[in-house]
Amino acid sequence: MSATTLEILEKLKAITLLEATELVSQIEKTFGVDASAPAVSGLRPILVEPIKQEDIIEEKTTFDVILEEVPSDKRVPILKVIRALTSLDLKQAKESITDLPKTILQGVSKEESEAAKQQLEAVGGKIKVS
């Protein structure tokens, strides 16, 4: 090791933790490096950007089927489908199509929500899956 290297090393041994932190910060700024990334011999350092919260996309696993609109001439067929999809009795099913929008199915799988949407749209209902 050269005399200059030994001199720098001895000075580094004597500095405080706060001074060492400031030194690392200045080295990162001056040389454009990231001291937190481990150095691997023979490989160039790879700069990695931190993952931002908005970059993380969570895929939904449960869905709600919401009945938004019922044409007056399609009420009976829609009632039949609602009763087939749910455990609602006739009175509850009628109430579900008068006070819209109304959640028909809640917390169901994607496949189940899509099947319900297709059935209800086939008889004239306007459906939203969320």
Curated annotation (Swiss-Prot):
Family membership noted in the UniProt record: Belongs to the bacterial ribosomal protein bL12 family.
Record gene name: rpl12
GO biological process: translation
Listed name of the protein: Large ribosomal subunit protein bL12c
Keywords assigned by UniProt, alphabetized: Plastid, Ribonucleoprotein, Ribosomal protein
InterPro entries noted in UniProt: Ribosomal_bL12, Ribosomal_bL12_C, Ribosomal_bL12_C/ClpS-like, Ribosomal_bL12_oligo, Ribosomal_bL12_oligo_N_sf
SUPFAM superfamilies recorded: ClpS-like, Ribosomal protein L7/12, oligomerisation (N-terminal) domain
An MF annotation (GO) of this entry: structural constituent of ribosome
Cell compartment(s), UniProt: Plastid
Cellular component GO terms held in the UniProt record: plastid; ribonucleoprotein complex; ribosome
Function: Forms part of the ribosomal stalk which helps the ribosome interact with GTP-bound translation factors. Is thus essential for accurate translation.
Self-association and partners: Homodimer. Part of the ribosomal stalk of the 50S ribosomal subunit. Forms a multimeric L10(L12)X complex, where L10 forms an elongated spine to which 2 to 4 L12 dimers bind in a sequential fashion. Binds GTP-bound translation factors.
PANTHER family according to UniProt: 39S RIBOSOMAL PROTEIN L12 (PTHR45987), LARGE RIBOSOMAL SUBUNIT PROTEIN BL12M (PTHR45987:SF4)
